[in-house]
Amino acid sequence: MHGKYTTLKDIVLDLSPDPVGLHCNEQLDSSEEDEVDEQATQATQATFTQHYQIVTCCGQCDSNVRLVVDCTGSDIQHLHKLLLGSLNIVCPLCAPQT
């Protein structure tokens, strides 16, 4: 560059793109990585508890029932499966009737 201002004549674009192979010849055993990741996730979930608010329907009168539970992520998933299955929660008004 000569002078105070840049002109198009001063810019030289002589670079061309180089093709680069993106394939790698390294072999990884994915089953070992999955096991390590799964164990780390389970260990983290086992020690970390959290409050979960649950709103469901009474098994007798279909009114809304609110629950707050303190459990781990895997426990709340298990509770979710139970609520979708045969487990029914009953409201305080219907509880004496059962």
Curated annotation (Swiss-Prot):
Region (E7 terminal domain) location: 1-41
GO CC annotation terms, alphabetical: host cell cytoplasm; host cell nucleus
Keywords (alphabetical) are: Activator, DNA-binding, Early protein, G1/S host cell cycle checkpoint dysregulation by virus, Host cytoplasm, Host nucleus, Host-virus interaction, Inhibition of host innate immune response by virus, Inhibition of host interferon signaling pathway by virus, Interferon antiviral system evasion, Metal-binding, Modulation of host cell cycle by virus, Oncogene, Transcription, Transcription regulation, Viral immunoevasion, Zinc, Zinc-finger
Give the matching InterPro entries.
Papilloma_E7
Motif residue range(s): Nuclear export signal: 76-84
Q: Which Gene3D superfamilies match?
A: 3.30.160.330
Q: How is it modified after translation?
A: Highly phosphorylated.
Sequence motif LXCXE motif, residues? 22-26
GO annotation (BP), single: DNA-templated transcription
ZnF region ranges: unnamed: 58-94
A Pfam family of the record is E7
| Compartments in which it is found | Host cytoplasm; Host nucleus
* Gene Ontology molecular function terms on file: DNA binding; DNA-binding transcription factor activity; protein domain specific binding; zinc ion binding
Question: Which top-rank group of organisms is this from?
Answer: Viruses
UniProt record similarity statement? Belongs to the papillomaviridae E7 protein family.
Quaternary context: Homodimer. Homooligomer. Interacts with host RB1; this interaction induces dissociation of RB1-E2F1 complex thereby disrupting RB1 activity. Interacts with host EP300; this interaction represses EP300 transcriptional activity. Interacts with protein E2; this interaction inhibits E7 oncogenic activity. Interacts with host TMEM173/STING; this interaction impairs the ability of TMEM173/STING to sense cytosolic DNA and promote the production of type I interferon (IFN-alpha and IFN-beta).
Record remark on domains = The E7 terminal domain is an intrinsically disordered domain, whose flexibility and conformational transitions confer target adaptability to the oncoprotein. It allows adaptation to a variety of protein targets and exposes the PEST degradation sequence that regulates its turnover in the cell.
Name the job this protein performs. Plays a role in viral genome replication by driving entry of quiescent cells into the cell cycle. Stimulation of progression from G1 to S phase allows the virus to efficiently use the cellular DNA replicating machinery to achieve viral genome replication. E7 protein has both transforming and trans-activating activities. Induces the disassembly of the E2F1 transcription factor from RB1, with subsequent transcriptional activation of E2F1-regulated S-phase genes. Interferes with host histone deacetylation mediated by HDAC1 and HDAC2, leading to transcription activation.
Report the protein name in the record: Protein E7
Query: What organism does the UniProt record list as the source?
Result: Pygmy chimpanzee papillomavirus type 1 (PCPV-1)
